[in-house]
């Protein structure tokens, strides 16, 4: 069954980066991406306004909202979902969350036709948020599960013989933990280090077509780490 084209707004604030993307009913794309540590609250709504104005639309034209559900900065994930919920409530529209790890893998496919991507975001506290994604008809699909893990433990549970040579390595985790990067030496370190709302649109639209968008009050973040054990580090979120 064909689905009528939708106008979809996507936003992410889960890392040091802040991004907004808009896909219109005629498949035009408008976007912004910026590094804005600790400025997400001030940047997101004005940027949403700018993107919508560039598209010559209004907020009322938006059919659904896609948000970066995490994992990432605890504060950033909360900011992103809260702003997305506020917009969705006001517009009486549904929302759908997309993994930040999947978004980076999807960008690697879009940029380099990558068939296998290992994504790792620096989770602080000596850990990474990690996942492996593989290409299925142009969509990067999770192989296994997303996890928060110490690099040493990851290397112990993932034999070097099972690593897929030539895979792209995306995210901040590889530069943060050089021993982990060395373990994946038969892979390619990508210049994709932050999730981008632009590359959440494809997965978000697929989920919307599958009727998986939910009311704002049902939208949930994905932290992976138990918030009870979350520790604030000096100068870090």
Language-model-detected regions and their locations in the chain:
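Stable alpha-helical structural segments in soluble proteins, enriched in small hydrophobic residues
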Residues: 51-55, 90, 108, 197-208
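Surface "functional belts" at beta-alpha junctions
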Residues: 3, 27, 39, 94-195, ...
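Acyltransferase
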Residues: 188-237
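Short glycine-aspartate micro-motif
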Residues: 8-10, 66, 76, 116-120
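Phosphate-handling active-site elements
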Residues: 55-60, 89-98, 112
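N-terminal beta-alpha supersecondary unit
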Residues: 2-69
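DPxDG-like acidic metal-binding loop motif
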Residues: 66-100
């Amino acid at each position: 069954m064909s689905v009528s084209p939708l106008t979809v707004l996507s936003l992410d604030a889960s890392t040091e980066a802040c991004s907004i993307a808009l896909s219109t009913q005629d498949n035009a794309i408008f976007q912004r991406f910026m590094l804005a540590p600790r400025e997400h609250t001030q940047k997101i709504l004005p940027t949403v306004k700018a993107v919508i104005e560039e598209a010559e639309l209004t907020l009322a034209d938006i059919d659904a909202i896609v948000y970066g559900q995490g994992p990432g900065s605890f504060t950033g994930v909360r900011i992103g979902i809260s702003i997305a919920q506020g917009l969705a409530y006001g517009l009486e529209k549904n929302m759908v969350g997309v993994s930040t790890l999947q978004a980076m893998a999807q960008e690697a496919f879009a940029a380099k036709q990558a068939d296998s991507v290992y994504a790792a975001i620096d989770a602080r506290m000596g850990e990474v948020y990690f996942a492996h994604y593989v290409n299925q008809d142009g969509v990067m699909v999770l192989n296994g599960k997303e996890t928060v893990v110490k690099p040493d433990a990851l290397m112990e549970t993932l034999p070097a013989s099972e690593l897929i040579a030539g895979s792209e390595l995306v995210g901040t985790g590889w530069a943060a933990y050089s021993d982990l990067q060395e373990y994946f030496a038969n892979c390619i370190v990508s210049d994709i280090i932050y999730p981008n709302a632009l590359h959440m649109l494809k997965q978000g639209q697929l989920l919307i077509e599958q009727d998986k968008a939910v009311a704002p009050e049902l939208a949930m973040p994905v932290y992976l780490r138990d918030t009870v054990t979350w520790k604030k580090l000096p100068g870090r979120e």
